[in-house]
Regions:
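Zn-dependent metallo-beta-lactamase
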Residues: 1-22
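Rieske [2Fe-2S] iron-sulfur-binding domain
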Residues: 16-103
Length: 103
């Protein structure tokens, strides 16, 4: 699959998340404290709330609706009410841009 240009690296603050819509899908793009970038599905697996409105801390994203918790580096569901993992996508940076490989 081709790499898709999602945003500039500076569009995402350290330890933060932004929403990225591509086609008919919504994704969440993250930047960790060590400046690594990650991408997951953008909607919580519990009630389809936008994760970009959630709180990011220590490589985790907290859903803004019911406080479910995911590890955004691997998509693992960490705290109820979420029990289904998030899908993750490969990310790389190139020439100041964040690129995502979608399936």
């Amino acid at each position: 699959m081709p790499w898709i240009d999602a945003c500039a690296i500076d569009d995402i603050e350290e330890e933060d998340v932004i929403r990225w819509d591509h086609g008919d899908r919504t994704f969440a793009l993250y930047r960790s404290l060590d400046n690594a970038y990650y991408c997951t599905d953008g909607l919580c697996t519990h009630e389809q709330v936008h994760l970009s409105d959630g709180l990011v801390m220590d490589n985790e994203i907290e859903c803004p609706k019911h406080n479910g918790l995911f590890d955004y580096t691997n998509g693992k569901a960490l705290r109820a009410p979420v029990c289904e993992d998030l899908k993750t996508y490969p990310v790389k940076t190139e020439a100041g841009r964040v690129l995502v490989e979608l399936d």
